[in-house]
Amino acid sequence: MLHFLSMLVLLVQPLGDLGAEMKTLSQRSITNTCTLVLCSPTENGLPGRDGRDGREGPRGEKGDPGLPGPMGLSGLPGPRGPVGPKGENGSAGEPGPKGERGLVGPPGSPGISGPAGKEGPSGKQGNIGPQGKPGPKGEAGPKGEVGAPGMQGSAGAKGPAGPKGERGAPGEQGAPGNAGAAGPAGPAGPQGAPGSRGPPGLKGDRGAPGDRGIKGESGLPDSAALRQQMEALNGKLQRLEAAFSRYKKAALFPDGQSVGDKIFRAANSEEPFEDAKEMCRQAGGQLASPRSATENAAVQQLVTAHSKAAFLSMTDVGTEGKFTYPTGEALVYSNWAPGEPNNNGGAENCVEIFTNGQWNDKACGEQRLVICEF
């Protein structure tokens, strides 16, 4: 009966108080089942009806994790996530097969001109070109020095008779002439009596002049004509000696080419323009000055044989862009490379010849092969 009353008290207690009471009971240990109602020992009565379910108690403390359950089935794939950051480049793969040739793109704009490249190796020697037309006749050179007198020439042919000279002064009386030949005998006269020998008779008158004789051979020329001949021969001898000296000096150069009256010789050295010019002058010549395609081809053969460009004698030191020979004469022949002369850098006053025979203006301080002209 007491149990029943206890249960009844609990049921009629307000829900707020019951929750507070339940909370109090959960925080302290229950020492006596009869805290709310004074209990006394009685006999057990009939069981009461089931009471109504109480409110859910407060959440208890989190318990220890249980044992892992079996792995569930894979869920459906979630939606595609955003693109992640770019990863590091992977190692290079093997090259794929060559693709088909693409369409030709439009031509690009011209690039900036690069620096001038180094001079390429000399090309093979080309064939000698056809002989050019003869150039105009050059100006007469300065008169040479009077040569040494030559040897006595042979007697010349008999010249025509000169005009009759003036009558000379009478000469001194000559010695008496020899007795003339006896005349023919006259007819015999009667025999006379021999008389005494008489005195010598007077000298007879001078006879009439005889006919003019044949003209004799011409004698030696007078001293003035002889002197002129000696001076002319002396000049020829000096010119021959000078020519022989030039050929003798030219023979000191290792190789050369002959064109007409000119000889081109190459030295085994490379010099600046002024030193090269002086070297040729001391040898009795000058730097090569080709005045025709034939002469230019001869110089080209020497340049090709040495595989080096060479200086020519022409410069534009006097007037920029106007190249002349050492004598100041304007060029009668040229073989400039395309775009030359261009005075690159503002200091190209000399001329060099390439292995292809073309010309280029060059700084005179550069070193080039020495080729002299004799």
From Swiss-Prot:
Annotated C-type lectin domain residues: 259-374
Modified residues (Phosphoserine): 109
Annotated disulfide bonds: 280-372, 350-364
Modification after translation, per record: S-nitrosylation at Cys-34 and Cys-39 alters the quaternary structure which results in a pro-inflammatory chemoattractive signaling activity with macrophages.
List of residues that carry Hydroxyproline: 77, 95, 170, 176
S-nitrosocysteine: residues carrying this PTM: 34, 39
One GO cellular component, as annotated: extracellular space
Extent of the signal sequence: 1-19
Biased composition annotated in UniProt, kind: Low complexity: 137-163, 170-200
GO biological process: innate immune response; lung alveolus development; negative regulation of interleukin-2 production; negative regulation of phagocytosis; negative regulation of T cell proliferation; opsonization; positive regulation of phagocytosis; respiratory gaseous exchange by respiratory system
Sequence positions bearing 5-hydroxylysine: 86, 98
Keyword Disulfide bond: yes
Function: Contributes to the lung's defense against inhaled microorganisms, organic antigens and toxins. Interacts with compounds such as bacterial lipopolysaccharides, oligosaccharides and fatty acids and modulates leukocyte action in immune response. May participate in the extracellular reorganization or turnover of pulmonary surfactant. Binds strongly maltose residues and to a lesser extent other alpha-glucosyl moieties.
Family: Belongs to the SFTPD family.
Protein name: Pulmonary surfactant-associated protein D
Gene (UniProt): Sftpd
